[in-house]
UniProtKB/Swiss-Prot annotation:
It comes from Phocaeicola vulgatus (strain ATCC 8482 / DSM 1447 / JCM 5826 / CCUG 4940 / NBRC 14291 / NCTC 11154) (Bacteroides vulgatus). GO terms for molecular function: ATP binding; ATP-dependent protein folding chaperone; unfolded protein binding. Residues 615-624 have a biased composition (Low complexity). Belongs to the heat shock protein 70 family. SUPFAM superfamilies: Actin-like ATPase domain, Heat shock protein 70kD (HSP70), C-terminal subdomain, Heat shock protein 70kD (HSP70), peptide-binding domain. Residues 625-638 have a biased composition (Basic and acidic residues). This is Chaperone protein DnaK. Induction: By stress conditions e.g. heat shock.
């Protein structure tokens, strides 16, 4: 059985881990970083960049650089108006009332953008493991709705991954933290404040069983919001000083976003920071600079409401778990925003104990996902995970009331049936409107899908018996069925409404993603081949200079001819011609080396061929070959 990787698909950063050698390993990406920015950029020529390369070019390409896409996952157009107003890229209303990202007229679903990030994580794992990866455990915020979970699973499918399990982020963090403590009896609180979401989960573990007692949170509260209060403050300060509105300039706003994020991070270890943005915007034809000092106290005042917003979910989670603060043995901080000192003070004050610093807030969720993957493949035995559904689920009944079938914090998998009847005489059809939330009226909750049960035998109101069954799987994804007990007619739906994607659309997007991955691979191979040729040209020219008159004229001529052929092929970027020219050059140089070796005897040894710096064999006739040496290409930074 292949490896199941663990992926933390974050709002700001993503991370991938795998269980290997009896422990989880966080895998560094191709840039050498253990976390990857959840950013996708579309650049000229149709090229796509993901992660750090995308982040580096964001300032000069703000309208085609996509970040914080997780905030749009599984949401309707109406639910993302606040987010749409914040981002510099264009978000439009698409099919089924869903948000789509418009890049040069091509509309991308949030799932497709997320899939591009997942492909990067998949490739990172494959490069490390040296084998194809097809299965993953992906984490989501504990308070994600059914449609948001479904959208995450779809993103995995588009990326070419079979999602074996969707795991709540705080639960994954608890798994990572408690793996070596699984046989202790402990109650822990996981406080997870990430880039876009906030979760609080209360768990109990002992005897290898990890049980979630309750969870609460806010899927629109996170580091992005803390950045935004700094951005808003800077915009207002500049308006007061210069009378100009920075929000009209997308490039300036992108610079503000980066500066705000940097300032927020610096204020976790310093009491003040300087924000210095020269030439931020021209005013009346004159370039203006933005220079401001932001103190930690001012930042905490700006973010006061956001910090306090973390409190109510904590109270609710403790109440739902039936515990008092003194019952909690340990508090675990997860997510980059949990590093904010005022947030840590709030947590310490609420729980009455200093939070544990024993886990890496940026990596622990991915590590927990890898642990869950190892549990599924039996690499880890004796560990049982009992998670819960974060929100109540039910249907709309007479009078627009929400009737709950499954309550929040019910252990999953879960199944519940209830019998309903018709609201009018001779009614032959009923609409099952599925809802998720905690409010009493249907309109106040989130609609996650609806379907019709037809063919009901005509009868007086209240006589037909319609059995509605809710079935939630281990991923927290819901299936609903309705059955007329009299006729035996049944209708079922796997809730996919808010994601708005059919199986056919997912398959089409998957094919496009694979095609793009293949195109990216070919582009990389092309660059590698050009670099290899460049290296061979450089090493050949150097060796021709070094050898000088020692090289016989009849051997030098074919080398120079092959070298010129390689230069021409390199200039034309003709990969086939490059291969041919490199082979000819190698043959010519080896012939010269063999003759020189014969002339010099054992004293001088063999000269290396031109490809030594490009991973080619130096001298196939020599018995003293060491391992290949790779030349590094350096680019001078001006």
């Amino acid at each position: 059985m292949g490896k199941i990787i663990g992926i933390d698909l974050g709002t700001t950063n993503s991370c991938v881990s795998v269980f290997e050698g009896n422990e989880p390993v966080v895998i560094a990406n191709s840039e050498g970083k253990r976390t990857t920015p959840s950013i996708v950029a579309f650049v000229d020529g149709g090229e796509r960049k993901v992660g750090d390369p995308a982040k580096r070019q964001a300032i000069t390409n703000p309208q085609r650089t996509i970040f914080s896409i997780k905030r749009f996952m599984g949401e309707t157009w109406d639910q993302v108006q606040k987010e749409t107003a914040r981002v510099p890229y264009k978000v439009v209303k698409g099919d089924n009332n869903t948000p789509r990202v418009d890049i040069d007229g091509r509309l991308y679903t949030p799932q497709e953008i997320s899939a591009m990030i997942l492909q990067k994580m998949k490739k990172t794992a494959e490069d490390y493991l040296g084998q194809e990866v097809t299965e993953a455990v992906i984490t989501v915020p504990a308070y994600f709705s059914d449609s948001q979970r479904q959208a995450t699973k779809e993103a995995g499918q588009i990326a070419g991954l079979e999602v074996k399990r969707i795991v709540n982020e705080p639960t994954a963090a608890a798994l990572a933290y408690g793996l070596d403590k699984a046989h202790k009896d402990m109650k822990i609180a996981v406080f997870d404040l990430g880039g876009g979401t906030f979760d609080i989960s209360i768990l109990e573990f002992g005897g290898g069983v990890f049980e979630v007692l309750s969870t609460n949170g806010d899927t629109h509260l996170g580091g992005d919001d803390f950045d935004q209060v700094i951005i808003d403050w800077l915009v207002q300060e500049f308006k007061n000083d210069e009378g100009a509105d920075l929000t009209k300039d997308p490039m300036a706003m992108q610079r503000l976003k980066e500066a705000a994020e940097k300032a927020k991070i610096e204020l976790s270890s310093s009491t003040s920071t300087e924000i210095n943005l020269p030439y931020i915007m021209p005013v009346d034809g004159m370039p203006k600079h933005l220079v401001k000092t932001l103190t930690r106290a001012k930042f905490e005042a700006l973010a006061h409401n956001l910090i306090q917003a973390c409190l109510e979910p904590c109270k609710k989670a403790m109440s739902d778990a039936g515990l008092s603060n003194s019952d909690i043995d340990e508090v675990i901080l997860v997510g980059g925003s949990s590093r904010i000192p005022a947030v840590q003070e709030l947590v310490e004050k609420f729980f009455g104990k200093t939070p544990s610093k024993g886990v890496n807030p940026d990596e622990v969720v991915a590590v927990g996902a890898a642990v869950q993957g190892a549990v599924l493949t039996d690499e880890i035995k004796g560990v049982v995970l009992l998670d819960v559904t974060p929100l109540s689920m039910g249907i709309e009944t007479l009078g627009g009331v929400m009737t709950k079938l499954i309550d929040a914090n019910t252990t999953i998998p879960a199944r519940k049936s209830e019998t309903f009847s018709t609201a009018a005489d001779n009614q032959t059809e009923v609409t099952i409107h599925v809802l998720q939330g905690e409010r009493p009226m249907a309109a106040q909750n989130k609609s996650i899908g609806q379907f019709n049960l037809t063919g009901i035998a005509p009868a007086r109101r209240g006589v037909p018996q319609i059995e509605v069954t809710f079935d939630i799987d281990a991923n927290g994804i819901l299936k609903v069925s309705a059955k007329d007990k009299a006729t035996g007619k049944e209708q079922a739906i796997r809730i996919e409404a808010s994601s708005g994607l059919s199986k056919e659309e997912i398959e089409k997007m998957k094919a496009e993603a694979e095609a793009n991955a293949e195109a990216d691979k070919k582009e990389r191979e092309k660059i590698d081949k050009l670099n290899q040729a460049d290296s061979m040209i450089f090493s050949t020219e150097n060796q021709l200079k070094e050898l000088g008159d020692k090289l016989p004229a009849d051997k030098k001529a074919p080398i120079e001819a092959a070298l010129q052929k390689l230069k021409d092929a390199h200039k034309a970027q003709d990969l086939s011609a490059i291969d041919t020219a490199m082979a000819e050059l190698n043959t010519a140089f080896q012939a010269a080396s063999a003759e020189m070796y014969a002339q010099s005897g054992a004293q001088g040894g063999a000269q290396a061929g031109p490809g030594a710096g490009a991973g080619q064999q130096a001298n196939q006739g020599s018995s003293n070959n060491k391992e290949d040496i790779q030349d590094a290409d350096f680019e001078e930074v001006k």
